[in-house]
Every structure is written in C-alpha cells, then in structure tokens.
Swiss-Prot record:
SMART domains, A to Z: KRAB, ZnF_C2H2
GO cellular component, one term: nucleus
Domain KRAB: 14-89
Organism of this sequence: Homo sapiens (Human)
Protein name: Zinc finger protein 559
Domain of life: Eukaryota
Keyword Zinc-finger carried by entry: yes
Length: 538
C-alpha cells in the first residue's frame, strides 16, 4: 500500500495526512475494541513501511512536528487517544507480547522492533537492526565486491574506512600501520614507540602503577582488562597451555612463552634506561616502579623505596619501633596486621594452605610456595660464584655470606662467629638453660622449634622421609640423608691423620680421639675414648 507509493517520493511531494488516519474524540468513542485494534494495526503497518525505506531521515524536512513525533515514537494525537482509551494496555506491545512499565520504553522498543524486523534479507532471511548494515549485507549477498586493502587483501565495509585522508592512498589507516609498522605514539618513560593510543595508555599504567581493573570477588587489581580476564579464568581453574619441559600448565600462551625462558635462561626484555634484562614483562614493570624517580615513596631514614604509601608507612614502624597490632593471647606485637594474622595461627593451629601433591598443610602461603619446590625441583636462587642453587631466598642469602668469609656476629662467651644474627641467638641457648619449646605430651623441652617438631613424631609415629631404594622410613630428613649413604657408599667425613672415612660427623669425632690422648669418660679408675666402651664396662 504505502511501500509502493513511497518509491515515487522523489517525483511527488506529499503530506502526512496522505498516509495517516486520524479521529476526533467524538469519533473515537464510537469505535468498539475490534475497530480500535484494527486502527492501531494499520498505523503500525504504515510505520513499518516507512522505516523499511529509511523514511525517518526525511521526516525532519518534509513533515510537521506532530507528524514527526508520531513516526519517531514521540507524543502525538494518536498516541494521546490510545493512552486515554487503553490506559495501561498501551504498554503491552502486541507484536511480541512484551510488557513495559513506562510509555517511553514502549516507544523505544516499538521503534527498535520494527527496524529489526523490516531490515530483513529476502535471500537468507537474516535480520538487521541498522539499515546501513543491511545495505552492506545486500551487497555481499548479490556478489558485489567490497573495497580491499591493496597489500593484504583485507575487506572493509566502506570506502571511507579504506582511503587515507592525508595521502589518499587506497589503504585502511589501521591496516596501514600494520604493514608499515608505524608507531606514532611514544612513551615518555621508556621512550618506546607504540602503534596506538590504547597501547600508550597501557604503558603509562605500567610505569605509574595504575591498576584500574578490579576483580570484585578476590579484591585484586590489574593494569589492563585482559589481565583481569585471564585472572578470572585462573580462578575458575581453566588451564590450556602446558610446558613440555616440566609440565606446568598456563592459562595463556604468552605466559607459557615467558615460562620457557626460565629453561633457556633467555632474557629478551631490556629496559633502555637502566640496561637491565628480564625474562618476564611484569618483572620489568616492577623494576621500573622501583627505579623511576617521582613514581615511588622513599624512606628518609634508610633510603628504601616503595611503590605505594601504605607500604612505606608500615616500613617506618621499623625505625620508630611502633607495633600497634598486639596478640591478645601472648602479648606479642607486630608492625602490620598481616603479621598478627599469621602469628595467631600458631595459637589456633590453623593451616589453611595445603599442598595438593602430598597433603601437607602450612600456616603461610609463602611456606607452601617454598614447599612446592621440593616436588618440582625448582631452585630459582642460584649463586653466581659457585653455581649452587637454593629453593628460598633466605638460604641463598646465608650462602652468599659464606663466600667472603665474613661472620659479623660473634658469641661473647666462646668466640664462635656466625653469618646471621638469628644463628647467634640460637647458639646462645647452648650456653644457657633456656629451652622455650616444650612438648605437650611428655613435658620435654627443647632449645629449638625444629627439635620439638622432630620429637613430636615419636608420639605420633610419623615417618615422612622414606627411602626410595629399600622403603625404610625416618622421622627426620637427616636420618634419610645418612641412610642413603649406605646405598651410595658415600663417606664424606675423612680423617686427616690416617685417611679413614665415615658416613657421619659424630663417627669421625669419636675416631679422632684414638689419635689423641683424650679419654673424657672416667669410671672405676679407668678412662675411655667413647661412651660405648664405658657402657660395656658398666
């Protein structure tokens, strides 16, 4: 009806009244429900045909304001009549049976519905919301060629996307940057060239420490949205890429690539300003935050640098001696809340971090991380002097102090020197009667917590260290170490006098007495070089 007439719009000028039917209030009251429904269907059909030929673009110039309002879903005399006579029924759209709470929502939905339905391809029955996309689809459906990039043959939807306005080259701007490797955006921090403004923004976030993307469930922040997406996959347990060398799984191929560098020791990411290389880009970012002036917080006392003010604030308490977090069980105080939380687990016995390999549980996540290396064999801390590797940083630091031969911590009673203050504190207990670690089962006390842990296995019968050769188990690791020498034949403790070797240091000490006149055990007038001979005499 209307569709055929509208094709001749360019020749004949018309008014809104040519396609619209209107009633007075008196005439409207004479219509029954069926007639009113018919009227509404006819008007909607007319509107559908108008949208089909993109008639909305002509409304502003050819039709009056009331007519525009009707076709664009705004208030008109027809809509007012429907509102008066139908009331709430106006908001139930009869085409898709969707109910809407507001009249404005109905108008928007009606316009979207008919536009979607009218932009429908007769060839493949696909429907489109926008006439421009529908027009493009019709071109591809009839075999019309789209404009292509003359270097990679990528097709684009419109010529204006393809032609560069500055050079008039037949090449899409984004595609042009890909082929020419153009990098017009330069980071002021690292002087790196970047292909787009979005890449520049991400680079600025890395240097500034900005992390705008937050995971609501785990309260973690990320510098860009892709990192947040990968993190969410990790939390869901999705792991896709596996290392062929060690079997470690990763959620992203880029993570696997970074991990492979740990096997090959390749350090491809270099910072231009400082000349230092890194295997992982996050390590570079961390290094930058610590080295770049103006983007960190410095302690005035010792010069130590921090990436955020809260960490600096906690550090300052080391100098002031302030410990605001106190344990209500034993009175021990800490500089930060995390230290108190970890300490409380020593009273409650809580060990929330469990190893999935052997089931062993730990009070701190860092202890679990170190423990996992005993299963994987990973030793990330390697000494450059002798090549010896360690599973944790504390062992590595202790080892590094052995090379210069410096032992700054001296015992005032016996003169023995130590490389760490903690070792000296432990040693001082050998001069005193202090035994702070007591067994709850039998009351026996020990100088060191490790000795108490070993002792408890006597009560529990636990023997976690098992020989893979013969199956014999031991309660302490040193017992397994000594036992393994019976299989390997190793005798590392050798006498400098006669060359005789032993599997244990205690055996060597006892043997050395045979070369000296030392006989410390005295009973019944006789002297003995070792306790076993004394036992036989008794």
């Amino acid at each position: 009806m209307v569709a055929g007439w509208l094709t001749n719009y360019s020749q004949d000028s018309v008014t809104f009244e040519d396609v619209a039917v209107d009633f007075t209030q008196e005439e409207w009251t004479l219509l029954d429900q069926t007639q009113r429904n018919l009227y509404r269907d006819v008007m909607l059909e007319n509107y559908k045909n108008l949208v089909a030929v993109d008639w909305e673009s002509h409304i502003n110039t050819k039709w009056s304001a009331p007519q525009q309002n009707f076709l664009q879903g705004k208030t008109s005399s027809v809509v007012e009549m429907e509102r008066n006579h139908f009331g709430e029924e106006l908001f139930d759209f009869n085409q898709c049976e969707k109910a809407l709470s507001e009249h404005s929502c109905l108008k928007t939905h009606r316009r979207t519905y008919f536009r979607k339905k009218t932009c429908e391809c007769n060839q493949c029955e696909k429907a489109f919301r926008k006439p421009s996309i529908f027009t493009l689809h019709k071109k591809t459906d009839i075999g019309e060629e789209l404009p292509n990039c003359n270097q990679c043959e990528t097709a684009f939807s419109q010529h204006l996307h393809l032609v560069c306005k500055k050079t008039s080259q037949n090449l899409h701007l984004v595609c042009k940057k890909t082929h020419t490797q153009e990098k017009p955006y330069k980071c002021s921090d690292c002087e790196k060239g970047l292909p787009s403004s979005s890449h520049l923004r991400e680079c600025v976030r890395i240097y500034g420490g900005e992390r705008p993307y937050t995971h609501k469930e785990y309260v973690e922040t990320f510098s860009h949205s892709t990192a947040l997406f990968v993190h969410m996959q990790t939390q869901d347990g999705e792991k896709f890429y596996e290392c062929k060398a060690c079997g470690k799984p990763f959620t992203e191929s880029s993570y696997l690539t970074q991990h492979l560098r740990t096997h090959s020791r390749v350090l491809p990411i270099e910072h231009k300003k400082f000349g230092k290389a890194f295997a992982f880009s996050p390590d570079l970012a961390k290094h930058i935050r610590l080295r770049t002036r103006g983007k960190h917080y410095v302690c005035n006392e010792c010069g130590k640098e921090f990436t955020c003010f809260s960490k600096l604030n906690i550090h300052i308490r080391v100098h002031t001696g302030e410990k605001p977090y106190e344990c209500n069980k034993c009175g021990k105080a800490f500089t930060d809340s995390s230290g108190l939380i970890k300490h409380r687990r020593t009273h409650t016995g809580e060990k929330p971090y469990e190893c999935k390999e052997c089931g062993k549980a730990f009070a701190n996540s860092s202890h679990l991380t170190v423990h996992m290396r005993t299963h994987t064999g990973e030793k990330p801390y390697q000494c450059k002097e002798c090549g010896k590797a360690f599973i944790n940083s504390s062992s590595f630091k202790s080892h590094m102090q052995t090379h210069p031969g410096v032992k700054p911590y001296d015992c005032q009673q016996c003169g023995k020197a130590f490389i760490r203050s903690s070792f000296l504190i432990r040693h001082l207990r050998s001069h005193s009667a202090e035994r702070p670690f007591e067994c709850e089962e039998c009351g026996k006390a020990f100088r060191y917590s490790s000795h108490l842990s070993q002792h408890k296995r006597i009560h529990t019968g636990e023997r976690p260290y098992k020989c893979q050769k013969c199956g014999q188990a031991f309660s302490i690791s040193s017992g397994l170490t000594v036992h393994m020498r019976t299989h390997t034949g190793e005798r590392p403790f050798e006498c400098q006098e006669c060359g005789k070797a032993f599997t244990r240091s205690t055996y060597l000490i006892r043997h050395l007495r045979s070369h000296s006149v030392e006989k410390p055990y005295k009973e019944c007038g006789q002297t003995f070089s070792n306790s076993s001979c004394l036992t036989e005499c008794v």
